Amino acid sequence: MSYDANAAYNSGAPGQGAPGAAGQGYGGQGFGGAPRGAASPDDLSLPLYGASFGQAVKRFFKNYVNFKGRASRSEYWFAYLFVGLLMIVPAILYSIGLGMMGASASMAAADPYGMSAAAGPSGASIALTAIGGILMGIIGLAVLLPQLAISWRRLHDGNFPGPMWFLGLIPGVGGIIVLVLMIMPPKPEGQRFDV
């Protein structure tokens, strides 16, 4: 005997006004099925489920400081991947500069008579560290509000209020809590945050 899911559950349409009826009950918001997504990448009012990398980055910057509505998991994670890729070159410059400073400091410390030519950090190491740090600061400031906004909208897609983002400020466990919330699948009830 095989299992028939349609027979196991009421496969008929719910009655008029039943909470599970799409478009009915709960004020006609349609919480009964899967979450409603954007039909076009240009529709910024709804999340774009299955967004490509390019679509997610465009939507990330077009919704620069929009804290209303929802963002899909693909939009959220591709936007964070983009920011991570932007930070690679400045982080490498910064790390090389710090490494050069550390090497010159260890050479100076290893010379007991102070006769080493490398008595301090070189100009190149200072320049690399400064350039890398400044670039990371500029990029970080440029994407601070968009990252906060997309995190806020991603929480909405999981039916969590946006201010739950501030749980990430709890030392030790806050980042893990927010990470778990961002991984959660979308919930139809999150449509209450749509504009």
At which residue positions do the language-model features occur?
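Hydrophobic alpha-helical transmembrane segments in multi-pass membrane proteins
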Residues: 75-102, 125-151, 158-184
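Gly/Pro-rich, low-complexity intrinsically disordered segments
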Residues: 7, 20-23, 37, 106-124
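Membrane-interface extramembranous regions at the lipid-water interface
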Residues: 2-82, 148-164, 180-195
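Short, surface-exposed, charge-dense and proline/glycine-enriched linear segments
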Residues: 98-110, 193-195
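Serine/threonine-rich low-complexity intrinsically disordered regions
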Residues: 4, 13, 40, 111, ...
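Short hydrophobic/aromatic-rich motifs at helix boundaries and adjacent loops
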Residues: 29-36, 122-125, 135
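Non-transmembrane, interaction-prone segments in cytosolic or luminal domains
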Residues: 44, 48, 53, 65, ...
